[in-house]
């Protein structure tokens, strides 16, 4: 899990400035061998089993790391979004990025229990 501190918001900092600063910090932590997936409200939605299956396929593609990026309060700039082809959405609803961290970690755990036939996920 890569954690990047969000840019402090002030009256003089415009949204594009905040997005750029957060994205610069993110890029510093990425490696060329990473598979990057943005968590974005306009991304592809999965149910839990579908997400588990997608995760399994990604894990078998030979990437050193799967990196899921959660944007800050203002999301990602269009330029940043366009650098990556994979965008997943957890919901059509809007949540704080802190809540998405929690929800996404639970879904990662759930996906692994589904793939390992663990009873955590009841179908």
Where are the regions a protein language model picked out?
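Short active-site-adjacent structural elements
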Residues: 47, 76-79
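Rossmann-fold NAD(P)-binding glycine/threonine-rich loop
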Residues: 71
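A short, terminal or domain-edge coil/loop segment
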Residues: 49-64, 91-98, 119-123
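S-adenosyl-L-methionine/SAH cofactor-binding core of RNA-modifying enzymes
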Residues: 5-64
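Structured adenosyl-cofactor binding patch, chiefly the S-adenosyl-L-methionine
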Residues: 78-122
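General small-molecule cofactor/ligand-binding pocket signal
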Residues: 2
